[in-house]
Amino acid sequence: GKTASQATSLIVNRRTKFPSSSYAVMDGNYKYQYDRYNSVYRYVPFNGDIAGVCAASDNINPFVSPAGFTRGNIRNVYGMALETSRANRDDLYTNGINPIITPTGGGKVLLGDKTLLSRPSAFDRINVRRLFIILEKAIANAVQFSMFEFNDAVTRGNFVAQVEPFLRDVRASRGITDFRIICDTTNNPPSVIDRNEFRGDIFIKPNRSINFISLNFVAVASGVEFNEVVNAV
């Protein structure tokens, strides 16, 4: 058998064989699970479980992260092929591989929400990519009613009136922090209109999930006011 560090290196090397994509995710482990159809225990990839926690997240909102102790719990697992140290998990996560851990108290938890996008981008997180999939589908359904209408102020106003309430709802649900819709003569000049085209530009500020938590504890003397030391920390 291989050590955890050796196995981690092999997994990272395997990751390099895949192209960069925000539409793909990768974890680095196998689970030990009972196969009730054949009455044996066997190692099975976590792929189905990762899809399952994503599907379960849909019950809350598609744009929340499927990872963590709230939504990333994986059930009915009796063991894993690889138990990683923190250093191993850091190596995996740096390379876009989402670790699965055994926390104190038992159970298994997905502790990462990266996509396989190699370059720094908002789309290197699962929740952001899933958010934009939802937005693109919903807005595409709305814009189809503009087909074969006139590209004038009325049609452009109707488009904005359809999309804006939807994005406000997403913002209220914490999926995005802000947005802006541009659909006027600035992006629909005569040249666009003469080509029988219609343009709507939608700028989105997606919400980001917390991946790291830093806690700083400071002992304060009894006679000292808090506001005296807060800014000094």
Give residue ranges: language-model regions:
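Structured, hydrophobic secondary-structure cores that serve as assembly/anchoring elements
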Residues: 1-233
